[in-house]
Regions:
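Cytosolic, long alpha-helical scaffolding segments
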Residues: 1-150
Length: 150
């Protein structure tokens, strides 16, 4: 990207796309890091792969990431706006998971370690959703020149 900036002298739109891409790379890298953290917890054996509590949250988060990348590829600000709105759904899933796990721990103290692992996974999914929102916000910036704070 730096070579492109120096050699091609991009105009405003090109410069916005380059700077937005650089910002998105950071968010995509963090998504990968958090996916790795989720995998480590699952591999540790404390969590069943098909844990019902997290299935819908995971699906919503994966959808957000996919749509944010699609919005970038297609320069689709409407899809980016949709991703931003979907963050409330993932935040709602996190709250439900958290409250369910608190109830589990109070009724069955032996569930403590497993519940903490599930809560960590839920928090990682919630953060992945936040990074998908960041990508969507940078899509809007790259197309319109306006940076939408979420």
């Amino acid at each position: 990207c730096l070579k492109l900036l120096l050699q091609q002298q991009p105009v405003a739109r090109d410069l916005r796309q380059i700077s937005a891409a650089l910002k998105m790379i950071t968010d995509l890298e963090r998504i990968g890091d958090q996916a790795e953290d989720i995998a480590e917890i699952v591999i540790s054996g404390q969590v069943n792969e098909g844990e019902e509590l997290l299935r819908d949250m995971a699906a919503s988060t994966i959808k957000m990431v996919t749509e944010s990348v699609d919005a970038y590829v297609k320069h689709d600000t409407m899809l980016a706006e949709k991703v931003i709105a979907e963050d409330d759904i993932v935040d709602g899933w996190f709250d439900r998971v958290k409250h369910t796990l608190i109830r589990r721990m109070t009724t069955d103290p032996g569930e403590g370690e497993r519940a903490v692992d599930l809560l960590m996974i839920a928090k990682y999914f919630e953060r992945i959703g936040d990074h998908a929102v960041n990508v969507a916000q940078w899509v809007i910036f790259s197309v319109t020149g306006m940076h939408k704070e979420g």
